[in-house]
């Protein structure tokens, strides 16, 4: 049973998260690779990693982790912040990158020496756990609506994501022009 104090803490956390997302989302897109606040929820890494931080359309990611963030941003833009599969796909992408780093014997590094993968990856991974938690709460209050059929087209050349499950949609992707894919995104 959820007590009044626990419920108010959850409500406060959700409010703070949403407020931070709204305030941060009013910023301009990034076309520069940056590394700030590497070990906090206020992280900004590459062009695409961080709450409310996003790259300008057509901007290539700074490294493989930034490519995972770019793919996540594209999914959230289309499906909404409460679509949990976007967050789960991001975690799979980061897990795959982590395994690749371990097998590279230290040769695979991110673009920033100030924010090495050893600090950035756990930070964004833990932040995504919060995203999954708050998405679940958001879906209680605002369940997805069936109906519209948006289509996404993304160049996945650098993202290294697993597209077998349709980026979390369970729909097949149509490949065209090399690494460009498109899919109908039914909820």
Swiss-Prot record:
Leader peptide range in chain numbering: 1-25
Domain of life, per lineage: Eukaryota
Entry-linked InterPro entries: PLipase_A2_dom_sf (IPR036444), PLipase_A2_His_AS (IPR033113)
Active site: 72
Disulphide bridges, residue numbers: 29-56, 33-62, 38-115, 49-69, 68-93, 75-86
GO biological process: arachidonate secretion; lipid catabolic process; phospholipid metabolic process; pollen development; pollen germination; pollen tube growth
One of the record's GO molecular function terms: phospholipase A2 activity
Catalytic activity: a 1,2-diacyl-sn-glycero-3-phosphocholine + H2O = a 1-acyl-sn-glycero-3-phosphocholine + a fatty acid + H(+)
Binding positions (Ca(2+)): 48, 50, 53, 73
Localisation per UniProt entry: Secreted; Golgi apparatus, trans-Golgi network; Endoplasmic reticulum
A GO-annotated cellular component: extracellular region
Matching PROSITE patterns: PA2_HIS (PS00118)
Note describing how the cofactor binds: Binds 1 Ca(2+) ion per subunit.
Annotated function: PA2 catalyzes the calcium-dependent hydrolysis of the 2-acyl groups in 3-sn-phosphoglycerides. Releases lysophospholipids (LPLs) and free fatty acids (FFAs) from membrane phospholipids in response to hormones and other external stimuli. Plays a role in pollen development and germination and tube growth.
Protein name: Phospholipase A2-gamma
Family to which the UniProt record says this protein belongs: Belongs to the phospholipase A2 family.
Tissue specificity comment: Strongly expressed in mature flowers but weakly expressed in other tissues. Detected in buds, open flowers and in pollen.
Miscellaneous comment text of the record: The enzyme has a slight preference for phosphatidylethanolamine over phosphatidylcholine.
Keywords assigned by UniProt, alphabetized: Calcium, Disulfide bond, Endoplasmic reticulum, Golgi apparatus, Hydrolase, Lipid degradation, Lipid metabolism, Metal-binding, Secreted, Signal
């Amino acid at each position: 049973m959820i007590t009044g104090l626990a419920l108010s803490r959850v409500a406060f956390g959700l409010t703070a998260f949403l407020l931070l997302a709204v305030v941060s989302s009013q910023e301009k897109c990034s076309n520069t690779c940056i590394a700030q606040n590497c070990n906090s929820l206020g992280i900004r890494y590459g062009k695409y990693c961080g709450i409310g931080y996003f790259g300008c359309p057509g901007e290539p990611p700074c490294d493989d982790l930034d490519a995972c963030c770019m793919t996540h941003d594209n999914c959230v833009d289309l499906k909404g912040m409460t679509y949990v599969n976007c967050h789960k796909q991001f975690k799979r992408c980061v897990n795959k990158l982590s395994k690749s780093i371990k097998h590279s014997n230290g040769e695979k590094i991110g673009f920033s020496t100030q924010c090495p993968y050893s600090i950035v990856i756990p930070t964004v991974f833990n932040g995504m756990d919060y995203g999954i938690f708050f998405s679940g709460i958001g879906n209680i209050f605002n369940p997805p609506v069936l109906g519209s059929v948006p289509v996404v087209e993304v160049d996945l050349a650098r993202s290294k994501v697993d597209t077998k499950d349709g980026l979390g949609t369970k729909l097949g992707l149509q490949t065209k022009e090399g690494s460009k894919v498109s899919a109908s995104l039914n909820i």
